Swiss-Prot record:
Protein name: p-hydroxybenzoic acid efflux pump subunit AaeB
Pfam families for the chain: FUSC
Transmembrane segments: 13-33, 38-58, 69-89, 93-113, 121-141, 152-172, 370-390, 407-427, 431-451, 455-475, 482-502
Gene: aaeB
Gene Ontology molecular function, alphabetical: transmembrane transporter activity
Protein's job: Forms an efflux pump with AaeA. Could function as a metabolic relief valve, allowing to eliminate certain compounds when they accumulate to high levels in the cell.
GO cellular component, one term: plasma membrane
One Gene Ontology term from the biological process aspect of the record: carboxylic acid transport
Keyword Cell inner membrane: yes
Species assigned in the record: Shigella boydii serotype 4 (strain Sb227)
Subcellular location: Cell inner membrane
Main location: membrane
Bilayer topology: Multi-pass membrane protein
NCBIfam families: PRK10631.1
Length: 655
């Protein structure tokens, strides 16, 4: 598809974006707002942002949720800006520097929270900076400006939501239903591959794809939850299905690993059974019914524990899947499944990455301040705002450099486009609200097409063009002011890009090591006799960390296999019948403390020392298990875990 071609599926959102812009423009001028531009800009960003992220029309609820986050971020930023101004109005330079630190602090938080919620914190950072910079000539008008800014933003968000509702947004429910069916078939096919014990690379690709698809289904659940409250029951079921899908992956991969040392555990009965190919969810349903009969006939003791656990999880998955598709009332059997174990939240492994983002944002804002004060340029304030916007938004994403380039391309494209509107279109349409609305609707329509195609610079061009054309009340046309604003945007983006290049992010290897050590800590923490601790559900958190590892190190199969082995060890030890006595309980606590020291160690020497101590404690623990006559279900997983840690100790301790 060419850059300027229009696909049918893109037209509806383009009309939706144009409608949001026109509504915000009309309401802004109708209520005599001082700067309707902010309402129009907000409507455009709230509507276009999810479309750019999705690469097409966003699903129902995405625009509303983004608008909600923007309101929260704006209010937090306005309150922070007011507090900073009240406390430091007598020291303007210090006030701006504190604002720069506040922007960095918000970026630091946004790097640690969930990616969906990070938008609010990024917005809070640069909103405070915008307020502080804008009120420099008249600081006594700060409360009035903050109220006006909040009002204009709320109007823009409401207009974007109304436009979204007018053009019947897509529901994600049908996609969820199809993915649930397809995912079950893929889970069965993974188990077939693992029982055949064929090529390891094929198995690695299969389980890696399933981890990504399960994570994608979790994202769909979030969208469905945002869409409407009527999907509350489906949302509860999908949350449990996430854990069940991860359990199926874990049991399949453990079946494969067991055959490396004890292939006789998988009998010919099960090998022949899983030879039957499946194509649809109905085929899987028939096979599961037959498999349950086989297990009932052979007995639980004669069935490998991984296959028995896999069938139990697949049966629960199937039951909840039917409930999601029909969205019927939750019955007693489903309620028992949904009342499962509480999920555990783990500490972020990206703290060093978050600190790099803090310094990038803070230093770029301070650099912008120095540039503004040194040059005395009237649009230095505009450059500072763009610096804060680019760094706050770029830092949340996997590739900040490309986001900064997108903004540079967008601001460059906005210069001729804004020039056309400033010199020709708006002066000739300002006497007619209808013509003015049509002219901006055309801009929104065509940029809406390009935003959905993720054309480099399209999102930046949309925001930058609206920002520099005259949409104030009353309209004034000063060419020097327009040129200053346009050049200020470009200079701000270039300065932000320069700081991103200079402050290098070398946290990738450290993050990978912390993630692997967190897997080790989780496996060690599973060795416990505490009933409450054994009931905790670590699986979603562990696979979330594995997904992050896969994104940080694409194609690094040894790391993925090591992480998956730790997850399998955690699940097996969690269910192992460890003898209950005070001696073992005290030693469990000691090993957990040592594992925590491995994660928190700041130097390689300390980390190696604590890791060596952990290996010694595992040897002592195995001896204690023999003394207390622990069954093979306990001793074998512990022995495998100790062997893995010995084998990979350099990868787990060296920077």
């Amino acid at each position: 598809m060419g850059i300027f071609s229009i696909a049918n599926q893109h037209i509806r959102f383009a009309v939706k974006l144009a409608t949001a812009i026109v509504l915000a423009l009309f309401v802004g001028f109708h209520f005599q707002l001082e700067t309707p531009r902010w309402a129009v800009l907000t409507a455009a960003i709230v509507a276009a942002g999810p479309a750019f992220a999705a690469g097409g029309e966003p699903y129902s609820g995405a625009i509303r949720y983004r608008g909600f986050l923007r309101i929260i971020g704006t209010f937090i930023g306005c309150i922070a800006g007011l507090v900073i101004i009240i406390a430091m109005i007598r020291a303007p330079l210090l006030m701006i520097l504190v604002c720069c630190i506040w922007a960095g602090f918000c970026t630091w938080i946004s790097s640690l929270v969930r990616i969906e919620n990070s938008y609010a914190w990024g917005l809070a950072g640069y909103t405070a900076l915008i307020i502080v910079i804008t009120i420099q000539p008249e600081p006594l008008l700060t409360p009035q400006f903050a109220v006006e800014r909040c009002s204009e933003i709320v109007i823009g968000i409401v207009c974007a939501i109304i436009a979204d509702l007018l053009f019947s947004p897509r529901s994600i429910k049908q996609e969820v239903d199809r993915e649930l069916e397809s995912l079950l078939v893929a889970q069965y096919q993974l188990m077939q591959l693992c029982i055949k014990h064929g090529d390891g690379e094929v198995v690695d690709k299969a389980w890696g794809d399933l981890v990504r698809r399960t994570t994608g289904l979790q994202g769909m659940r979030s969208n469905l939850n945002m869409e409407s409250s009527r999907w509350a029951r489906a949302n509860r079921r999908l949350k449990a299905i996430n854990t069940l899908s991860l359990t199926l992956i874990t049991q399949s991969c453990e079946t494969y690993l067991i055959q490396n040392t004890r292939p006789e555990l998988i009998t010919d009965t099960f090998r022949e059974f899983f030879d039957t190919p499946v194509e649809t969810a109905q085929d899987v349903h028939k096979q599961l019914k037959r498999l349950r009969r086989v297990i009932a006939w052979t007995g639980e003791r004669e069935t490998p524990v991984t296959i028995y656990s896999w069938v139990a999880a697949a049966t629960r998955y199937q039951l909840l899947k039917r409930g999601v598709i029909s969205n019927t009332k939750i019955n007693a059997t489903e309620e028992e499944i949904l009342q499962g174990e509480p999920e555990v939240k783990v500490e972020s492994a990206e703290r060093h990455h978050a600190m790099v983002n803090f310094w990038r944002t803070t230093l770029s804002c301070i650099l912008g301040t120095l540039f503004w004060l040194w040059t005395g340029w009237t649009s230095g304030s505009g450059a500072m705002v763009m610096i804060a916007v680019v760094t706050s938004l770029a830092m949340r994403l996997p590739n900040p450099r490309m986001v900064a380039i997108d903004f540079i391309y967008g601001t460059l494209a906005a210069l001729p486009l804004g020039l056309l509107y400033f010199l020709v279109i708006i002066p000739n349409t300002q006497q007619s609200m209808l013509l003015l609305c049509i002219s901006l609707a055309v801009l929104g329509f065509f940029l809406g097409i390009e935003v959905q195609q993720r054309l480099l610079g399209s999102m930046g061009a949309l925001a930058s063009t609206i920002n520099i054309i005259v949409l104030d009340n009353p309209m004034t046309f000063h060419f020097s002011q327009f040129l200053d604003s346009a050049l200020g945007q470009i200079v701000g983006c270039v300065l932000a890009f320069t700081v991103i290049l200079l402050v290098r992010d070398k946290s990738r290897d450290r993050t990978g090591r912390v993630l692997l050590n967190q897997f080790v800590s989780a496996a060690v923490s599973a060795m416990t006799t505490n009933v409450a601790r054994r009931k905790e559900n670590h699986l979603p958190a562990l696979y979330q960390q594995l997904f992050l590892l896969m994104n940080k190190f694409p194609g690094d199969l040894p790391k993925f296999r090591l992480a998956l082995t730790m997850i399998i060890a955690h699940q097996r030890l969690r269910d192992a019948p460890i003898p209950v006595n005070e001696d073992l309980s005290a030693f469990h606590r000691q090993m957990r403390r040592t594992a925590d020291h491995v994660i928190s160690a700041r130097s390689d020497d300390k980390r190696r020392r604590y890791f060596g101590q952990l290996l010694e404690e595992l040897e002592i623990y195995q001896e204690k298990l023999r003394i207390w006559q622990a069954p093979p279900q306990v001793t074998e997983p512990v022995h495998r875990l100790a062997g893995m840690l010995h084998k990979y100790q350099h990868a787990l301790t060296d920077s």
